[in-house]
């Protein structure tokens, strides 16, 4: 048996949707407060006082439903990936399912795997639909990422998410999956213990042993298993903790940056963690043409990567205009100062 993950039935994306909060804080503003002058990105998205990973997931799910044009009651599974769930004990997926009118006849669960929790949910949704157990399944990745005040994570930890409704490949799918591959090891590059408020990072483990090793290995293995080369892809979306890492990974794989830039959003909204590649793919689907092939590689600390190859179909031409596009949310912005940011992110502890 080969390494490629490919279900017996062909499945695809029936609908997709993204959401990015309106507020932004510039890296210069964070640097002003902490006396730092080297910035990894321009600005990041900040959730409002009434927003969290669940509300972001709901907005993304509603947009996916608009594009799918299906009855939410036909969705038999909603799986939500996040590392910033509002409840330690209580599923976020049930709240989302209720909000979009999908209850009660469905599976629901929350997934965790750092920044690739959303694509873990996607792998499960692909298998669930392909098995014949469901007509449609929804996978969501959303986060309101946190960074310790003054830590370099504070400059990049953003907020946003995306949802994908999976169904059997048909004239209604906007793109179909050619195959996928997952690669995991026990690599301690990033963690947060129970009762700790902010995550810690393993510094020297972050780059080569973690991100680059897993992303490049997953991408290369997927291409080898499918008999494809970098030249066969029109776009590539990699996990984007910053702007630099995805471009370096692309260079290591022989992929020109022009294929990466359309889905590279972290410079403008930050690292949305579980939502990062899913929002990036949504942005690419907003502009892609039928027949375009997209390489999609997530990464989650701890560590692992999921790699997918998807091919865009004719239905994208109509469906992409049925809900707000990623660029619409990025342009809908209001810049705030550090004081309001700290209040919105509840960094003041009394």
UniProtKB/Swiss-Prot annotation:
Residues where (3S)-3-hydroxy-3-methylglutaryl-CoA binds: 115, 156, 206, 239, 271, 301
Pathway(s) this gene product operates in, as recorded in its UniProt entry: Metabolic intermediate biosynthesis; (R)-mevalonate biosynthesis; (R)-mevalonate from acetyl-CoA: step 2/3
Which enzyme class? transferase
Question: Which top-rank group of organisms is this from?
Answer: Archaea
For this chain, the annotated S-S bridges are none
Residues the record marks as active site: 83, 115, 239
- List ligand-binding residues for CoA: 204, 244
Any single biological process term in GO? isopentenyl diphosphate biosynthetic process, mevalonate pathway
UniProt xrefs under Pfam families: ACP_syn_III_C (PF08541)
Enumerate the InterPro entries for this protein: ACP_syn_III_C (IPR013747), HMG_CoA_Synthase (IPR004656), Thiolase-like (IPR016039)
* UniProt keywords, alphabetically: Acyltransferase, Isoprene biosynthesis, Transferase
Q: Name the EC number(s).
A: 2.3.3.10
Q: Write out the similarity annotation.
A: Belongs to the thiolase-like superfamily. Archaeal HMG-CoA synthase family.
Q: Which NCBIfam families match?
A: HMG_CoA_syn_Arc (TIGR00748), PRK04262.1 (NF003274)
Describe the subunit structure.
Interacts with acetoacetyl-CoA thiolase that catalyzes the precedent step in the pathway and with a DUF35 protein. The acetoacetyl-CoA thiolase/HMG-CoA synthase complex channels the intermediate via a fused CoA-binding site, which allows for efficient coupling of the endergonic thiolase reaction with the exergonic HMGCS reaction.
Functional summary from the UniProt entry: Catalyzes the condensation of acetyl-CoA with acetoacetyl-CoA to form 3-hydroxy-3-methylglutaryl-CoA (HMG-CoA). Functions in the mevalonate (MVA) pathway leading to isopentenyl diphosphate (IPP), a key precursor for the biosynthesis of isoprenoid compounds that are building blocks of archaeal membrane lipids.
State what protein this is by name: Hydroxymethylglutaryl-CoA synthase
């Amino acid at each position: 048996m080969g390494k490629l993950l490919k279900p017996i039935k062909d499945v695809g994306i029936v609908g997709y949707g993204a959401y990015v909060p309106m507020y932004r804080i510039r890296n210069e503003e964070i640097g002003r407060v902490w006396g730092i002058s080297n910035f990894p990105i321009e600005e990041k998205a900040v959730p409002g006082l009434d927003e969290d990973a669940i509300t972001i997931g709901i907005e993304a799910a509603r947009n996916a439903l608009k594009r799918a044009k299906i009855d939410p009651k036909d969705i038999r599974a909603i799986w939500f990936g996040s590392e910033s769930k509002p409840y330690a004990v209580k599923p976020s997926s049930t709240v989302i399912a209720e909000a979009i009118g999908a209850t009660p006849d469905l599976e629901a669960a929350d997934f965790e795997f750092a920044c690739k929790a959303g694509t873990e949910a996607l792998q499960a949704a692909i298998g669930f639909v392909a098995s014949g157990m469901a007509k449609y399944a929804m996978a969501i990745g959303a986060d309101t990422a946190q960074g310790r005040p003054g830590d370099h994570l504070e400059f990049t930890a953003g907020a946003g998410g995306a949802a994908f409704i999976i169904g059997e490949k048909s004239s209604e799918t906007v793109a179909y999956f050619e195959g996928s591959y997952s690669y995991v090891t026990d690599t301690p590059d990033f963690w947060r213990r129970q009762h700790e408020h902010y995550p810690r990072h393993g510094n020297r483990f972050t780059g080569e042993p973690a991100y680059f090793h897993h992303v490049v290995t997953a991408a290369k293995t997927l291409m080898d298993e499918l008999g494809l080369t970098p030249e066969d892809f029109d776009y590539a979306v990699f996990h984007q903790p910053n702007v630099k890492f995805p471009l370096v990974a692309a260079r290591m794989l022989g992929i020109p940056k022009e294929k990466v830039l359309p889905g590279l959003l972290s410079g403008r909204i930050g690292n949305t963690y579980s939502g990062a590649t899913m929002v990036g793919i949504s942005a690419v689907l907003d502009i892609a043409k039928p027949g375009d092939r997209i390489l999609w590689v997530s990464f989650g600390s701890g560590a692992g990567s999921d790699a997918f190859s998807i091919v865009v179909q004719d239905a994208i031409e109509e469906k992409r205009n049925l809900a707000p596009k990623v660029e619409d949310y990025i342009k809908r912005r209001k810049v705030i100062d550090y004081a309001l940011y700290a209040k919105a992110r509840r960094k003041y502890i009394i």
